[in-house]
């Protein structure tokens, strides 16, 4: 598939030909489940203009059906463009196709979608990761030039890692969340999934910047990164030794080899440890589910979306939510409601917020001594469907990504190796808040080292 950088040089006729080619490929690969079944209308308008960018199904695109892969939003049509979509259009890009996802971005396998699961292009028996699994699978399968996803606890980086592409989560507040269906408002962040690091920088530059429509948007002027990329910068990189040592043998081996390559390339490597990852999991799932229980309370069948039959208002709420929300979403909403209840608020939610502050300080302390942090994306390669049937086991697959969201830092997933079964292994680079340039420079150098 043509890269985003190459696509910028195309004429209008060549872009039209690219859109037609993509539409044909998407229709021929429906079994992959990367795109939601609705393959007609403006979302795949081959006669439109603009370089095509695949869009996760929780980002508002005017006149599109946008459902967050949930039954409860069937029939909802977005009345406006999200800020990132407005920015795409202004820069000569265009939304092109809705990608599949875990329902309301709650999951790490893209199995909980109302539309059915997405497969991993490398091995159809394995998960593509999630929740932005459709976006990652589309890019990896060559049926998207690039895509937008959202990352609440690793939902861009982990599927990018499992599918073998680049996934970039900007600093919290760097990219506007206006028009993103909220899961956890203090953790959600939109970002690119691309074929390479340069493309990630290009797409990031398009969508980044202050937005008055988002109260959490970073107000300082954004300075573009793509035109300043430097793959020759020598950096101090902190390896999180305890996290590397916890991973499965094949992942650990690939990470250790990559560390040696970084040393050989002239980077200074220091070794650090972070707080036991179980604290990240506990704090994240308390905070995220608490915010989700509030955010998803707006879906009641009254104003928009699917509505169940009922004889009174309470019955309408109960029936609509019972039929509209999937099992995982209901589980997280119940957990969130529980931790916010009067008897448990201090015991759980307040403690989780204190833990979050401590986790953030830990990352910042390491980044006072280093330019970047190096750690795994996941403990293993992509696992088989049904392998992690217990929800708690599935939650642990995000163990190395969620801390970054709790700290609000920028991070990128870069492919570093394949195992004996040709499955992808990636590493994660994390930087200081709002210093995306260093993250992208380090990632570009790592990409160059790996590709030789």
Swiss-Prot record:
This is Glutamyl-tRNA(Gln) amidotransferase subunit A. SUPFAM superfamilies: Amidase signature (AS) enzymes. Keywords: ATP-binding, Ligase, Nucleotide-binding, Protein biosynthesis. GO terms for cellular component: glutamyl-tRNA(Gln) amidotransferase complex. Pfam families: Amidase (PF01425). One of its GO terms (biological process) is translation. The gene is gatA. Its EC number is 6.3.5.7. The active site is at 56 (charge relay system), 131 (charge relay system), 155 (acyl-ester intermediate).
């Amino acid at each position: 598939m043509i890269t985003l950088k190459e696509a910028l040089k195309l004429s209008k006729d060549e872009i039209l030909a690219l859109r037609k080619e993509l539409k044909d490929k998407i229709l021929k690969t429906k079994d992959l489940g990367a795109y939601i079944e609705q393959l007609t209308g403006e979302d795949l308008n081959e006669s439109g203009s603009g370089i095509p960018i695949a869009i996760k199904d929780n980002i508002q695109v005017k006149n599109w059906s946008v459902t967050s892969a949930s039954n409860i939003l069937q029939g909802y049509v977005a009345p406006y463009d999200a800020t990132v979509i407005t920015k795409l259009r202004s820069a000569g890009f265009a939304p092109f196709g809705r990608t599949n996802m875990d329902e309301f971005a709650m999951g790490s396998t893209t199995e909980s979608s109302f539309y059915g699961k997405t497969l991993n292009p490398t091995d159809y028996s394995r998960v593509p990761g999630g929740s932005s699994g459709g976006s990652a699978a589309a890019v990896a399968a060559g049926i998207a030039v690039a895509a937008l996803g959202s990352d609440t606890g690793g939902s861009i980086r982990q599927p990018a890692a499992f599918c073998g592409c680049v996934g970039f989560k900007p600093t919290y507040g760097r990219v506007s969340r206006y028009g993103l269906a909220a899961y956890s408002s203090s953790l959600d962040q939109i970002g690119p999934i691309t074929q390479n690091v340069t493309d990630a920088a290009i797409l990031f530059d398009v969508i980044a910047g202050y937005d008055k429509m988002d109260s959490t948007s970073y107000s300082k002027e954004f300075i573009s990164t793509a035109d300043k990329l430097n793959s020759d910068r020598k950096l101090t990189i902190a390896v999180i030794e305890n996290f590397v040592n916890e991973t499965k043998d094949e992942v650990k081996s690939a990470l250790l080899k990559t560390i040696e390559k970084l040393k050989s390339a002239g980077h200074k490597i220091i070794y650090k440890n972070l707080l036991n990852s179980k604290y990240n999991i506990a704090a994240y799932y308390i905070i995220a589910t608490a915010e989700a229980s509030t955010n998803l309370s707006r879906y009641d069948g009254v104003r928009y979306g699917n509505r169940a039959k009922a004889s009174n208002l309470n019955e309408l709420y109960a029936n609509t939510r019972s039929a509209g929300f999937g099992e995982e979403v209901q589980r997280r909403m119940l957990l969130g409601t529980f931790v916010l209840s009067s008897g448990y608020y201090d015991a759980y939610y307040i403690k989780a917020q204190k833990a979050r502050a401590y986790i953030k300080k830990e990352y910042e302390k390491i980044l006072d001594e280093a330019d970047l942090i190096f750690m795994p994306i996941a403990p293993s390669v992509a696992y088989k469907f049904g392998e992690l049937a217990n929800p708690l086991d599935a939650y642990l697959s995000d163990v190395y990504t969620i801390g970054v969201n709790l700290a609000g830092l920028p991070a990128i997933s870069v492919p570093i190796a394949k195992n004996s079964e040709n499955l992808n292994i990636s590493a994660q680079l994390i930087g200081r808040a709002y210093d995306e340039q260093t993250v992208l420079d380090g990632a570009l150098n790592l990409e160059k080292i790996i590709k030789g």
